[in-house]
Amino acid sequence: MYMARCGPKNNVLCFPFQLSFLFSKRLINKRFKYTLQTEDEKDMMGSLSKNKIITPEDVEFKLAQLREFSNTLKERIHNTKSVNSDGHQSNSIAPISEDSRNVNVTKISSVPNEEKSKNLSDLIHSSFLEKMDHLVPKVIRERVADDDILAKNLFDRSHSNWAPVIDRLYVSEKRFMDIDSREFSVWLNGTVKYLPFHSILHLDEMLLEQINGDVVKFNTHMYECIFNNLGNLKPTNFNQDGTNDKVILKMKELLERYDKALKITEERINKKEGFPSKVPKMTQAILNNCLKYSTKCSSFHDMDYFITKFRDDYGITPNKQNLTTVIQFYSRKEMTKQAWNTFDTMKFLSTKHFPDICTYNTMLRICEKERNFPKALDLFQEIQDHNIKPTTNTYIMMARVLASSSSNAVVSEGKSDSLRLLGWKYLHELEDKNLYRHKKDDLNLFLAMMVLAAFDGDIELSRALYYLFIAKKYKTLCANWKGNILVDQDTIWKSTLMPEMLNYLMLAYARFDPRNLPVLSGYEKGIELRRKFLREFDSSMRLDDTDKLVKFKLPFLPISDLNSEAQVLAESNAIWSFNLENGGTRNTLTSSNEAALEDIKKYRQLLDSFAQEAEDFNEFKFKVMYEVTKMQRESINVNVFNKISLHTYLSIPINLKQQKEFLRRLTFFTFQQHEFEAVIKRLYEGYRNIPSSHTRDQNSISTEAISVSKPETTEDLNLIMHDIWYITCLRHKIMMDTTLYELVMKAAIEFQNEDLAKKVWNDRGKFRTTVPFLKMDQRIRIAKDQKFAHLMVEFFTKQGKYSDAIAIILSSKNRFNWTYSMVRNLHKALEEIEDRNSVEILLDVVNKKSHAKALKWEEQELNM
């Protein structure tokens, strides 16, 4: 351990206490890390012969040494400061004033030191000067005139923040004036990054001022710096489509400036005023930043504008990086056909444009969405044939593609288990290769294993993976938490719980089948891997009971093997509620009668004020919807409560054939748009028609009038109370959409519940008249209608009502594209009863050869 003497000395430059302690802390950390590393290496060498393991107690002992040393050093620096201020003026130099902060201190620090070793202040000062020389030019440091800002925001390069530095330069007197623009701009482009939009505007203004507004002198490095910072920005939530986006407009303004510079240069050449020494040029990096931000906005129009602009005006065609960005955009927008076309173009354009591993990983992600495992296998073979080195994410994506493809018997060609087995083989290969893993790869790896285990219905492994990942993340957050862990449990759990992990755990519950054996139990390597996770899960559950530092519990049943449907339903409900209530830190889903009455009273007054303040019904509706959203964010973990996870959660009782539990979950966690609008309208009209209590006190109303209207008023108030409770419960509900209506129809098919089928048919018909449905793209609306019609045909087929099923097909034959796969079950049923006439009509619709008999059938139905 290194120690430093900190007593008062001659010729010592004194820094402010906070700055001195900051630098000393960094220096000590550096030295301590080196000491630990040296000692650890010695311990490791010794452990080869002694089999000695470094225990947590040893690490804690070293950390205690560091804390004690830091406290001692802090006290000595404080004592030195006190001694200097009390009377040792002859042995010290006064603290640096604001005016003299940026004096050339190199001369001062170069005073001959007669002692052999420098004191701590000398080391701090020399380290500060050396690091500053690498961070900012000397002239910039002088104009910032605040070493504290530079040290605080720039010393940690992994978290450097240039915004305060740029803003400080913006308010300085000289800014960038009288600085060599070429040398300065080279440094600027490679250093200043991740500025907010207002700081980018300040930087652009100062650069223009530096060249006296001559846009011809605005060189390539300046353009690249500005575009790089613009490309790293994120669009605002209310402007995701890029319409009139301020960043897009700024990019176009810069391109107009460049066009103006080219025009001025051409005019100067024609007038023989001299050719500029260096004309700025547009680059591939600038194009990529334009495309990167356009894809964040999901703006196809802007992306096409930039590609066309650079190609036609500047002769710059998209390179490999640009095309990869375009493919990623297509992937996010579900434009898979365009993505495949662009990918094929890259392969056959030239060797410079040939896809790299990043592009292949993007295409594998598209294969996962399409459940196209044959194409994914072809892509992986291409990677090997072209000697492209796969990354960790490549193997993870292959496992995910095979897992998602195995979920459908038709897609998997009846080989679901084989696909999942192959997916595990890719993960084994990843483990054997020991490739570099980014910290995000651990999450992706856990998710890949969760996907494979979930689609396999392996509840035991899914529980273990979920528990181990959430426990690791929770304890890591607690270990690094700067606040009070007990007080901040709500925030910690919100950062810990993940919607993807919850969704795959719910999927494992939904695919529960005690008769099936996991695919991992079929070979030795799989058995070892599965036992490893189950063993860690079991030991973690036991050890956490004695962990007094960080208490961590998940509401799993205290049994290692779930073997009944009741257990699956109970545990899935517990885990679901635990996630929605943010790790048990909120009490939203279970409330007492007293609490419910308090909520009704509170929101009755609030809704009353909304109704009185609103100018019309639309304003009242907006206020209520805003309040519901606010209420939901305050009481529910909205990160995990989404339509995808809810869909999976509702599918559990369907697959387990538990109709009562399904209806309970559906009613408790969903609401319908038309019902919501009816309740809002009743409340608005009720508040408008019934005078407030204050108004009734002022008006003279006879006792007889009150008694006559009392029964009606009581009934109306009961209805209002019911409607207010409906609004209050929306905090844990999600609006029904086309996907959820399809799920309810699947439940009606599974349970053979005709009443449920009729209800969902009518409810969806009302939903089709609401704004959310009408706002959907027409092609999507038709596709959703066709999917629901197909489910209705399946329901009537299973009910044996073949005439009703055929009637649905005939009534929609001109609107929907009926294929044989959609009517296969109906066709088989008609063949079994030997209804040749209906079979012929059905096949005519599917094959679209002739609609004559179909029309005849319609005529017969109408006559009947």
Swiss-Prot record:
UniProt KW keywords: Mitochondrion, mRNA processing, mRNA splicing, Repeat, Transit peptide
Location in or out of the cell: Mitochondrion
Principal location: mitochondrion
InterPro entries: Pentatricopeptide_rpt, TPR-like_helical_dom_sf
Note: Involved in mitochondrial-nuclear incompatibility, a major determinant in reproductive isolation between species, through hybrid incompatibility of Ccm1 and its interacting partner 15S rRNA between yeast species.
Protein name, UniProt field: Mitochondrial 15S rRNA processing factor CCM1
PANTHER family per the UniProt record, alphabetical: PENTATRICOPEPTIDE REPEAT-CONTAINING PROTEIN GUN1, CHLOROPLASTIC (PTHR47936:SF1), PPR_LONG DOMAIN-CONTAINING PROTEIN (PTHR47936)
Transit peptide: 1-76
Assembly information from the UniProt record: Binds to mitochondrial small subunit 15S rRNA.
Repeat (PPR) residue spans along the chain: 319-353, 356-390
Family under the similarity heading: Belongs to the CCM1 family.
GO biological process: mitochondria-nucleus signaling pathway; mRNA processing; RNA splicing
Function text: Regulates mitochondrial small subunit maturation by controlling 15S rRNA 5'-end processing. Localizes to the 5' precursor of the 15S rRNA in a position that is subsequently occupied by mS47 in the mature yeast mtSSU. Uses structure and sequence-specific RNA recognition, binding to a single-stranded region of the precursor and specifically recognizing bases -6 to -1. The exchange of Ccm1 for mS47 is coupled to the irreversible removal of precursor rRNA that is accompanied by conformational changes of the mitoribosomal proteins uS5m and mS26.
Keyword Repeat recorded: yes
